[in-house]
């Protein structure tokens, strides 16, 4: 079993959220067993049977084809953030792909996704849960060596973590771990700027 399957076997809740598509590498690694990140259909079909309690991210147009698969596995399926009812057993929320500021198509900000996810997990899993929060666009902007946009996404990630810390800081059983899976774009701080 993968980590999330093991945690489900232990009776814990599992939530996976990202600003990127839910079929992207990080989320797929926690919710499928495919050996190729380009096996999108296989990833999504495995996600429907994964037992993950909460999926939030982008990919609405892609996931629409699999809506019935998720519903048949007891997921409440949402494609509008404002319609999500956290009083459900399992949720998948898939939103518009991330776009530039010239379009109206954007997924909810990471801090909003994270707050909803924490509320859902806290309400439904009193014995504990595992929540992955990914800002996939930090990596994308770094690949493009777009430092300004990368910093904006990093600030939103920081806001999401700060909000989570504030809501959970009095819980002695909670651990918040912040990690990077790799560096891209050769971003280097030289220590000279203020």
State where each predicted segment sits:
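Mobile, glycine-rich extracellular loop/lid and propeptide segments
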Residues: 1, 5-8, 12-25
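A post-motif C-terminal structural segment
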Residues: 23-194
């Amino acid at each position: 079993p993968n980590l999330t399957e093991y945690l489900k076997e232990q009776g814990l809740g599992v939530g996976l959220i990202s600003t990127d598509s839910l079929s992207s590498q990080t989320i797929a690694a926690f919710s499928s067993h495919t050996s190729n990140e380009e096996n999108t259909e296989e990833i999504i079909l495995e996600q429907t049977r994964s037992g993950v309690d909460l999926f939030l991210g982008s990919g609405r147009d892609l996931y629409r084809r699999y809506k019935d698969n998720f519903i048949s596995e007891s997921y409440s399926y949402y494609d509008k953030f404002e319609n999500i009812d956290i009083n459900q057993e399992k949720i998948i929320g898939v939103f518009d792909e991330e776009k530039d500021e010239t379009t109206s198509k954007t997924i909810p900000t990471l801090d909003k996704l994270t707050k909803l996810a924490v509320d859902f997990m806290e309400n439904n899993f009193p014995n504990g849960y595992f929540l992955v929060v990914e800002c996939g666009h930090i990596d994308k902007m770094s690949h493009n060596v777009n430092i300004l946009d990368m910093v904006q996404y990093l600030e939103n990630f920081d806001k999401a973590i700060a909000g989570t810390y504030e809501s959970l800081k009095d819980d002695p059983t909670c651990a918040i771990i912040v990690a990077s899976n790799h560096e891209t774009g050769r971003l280097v701080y030289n220590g000279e700027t203020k």
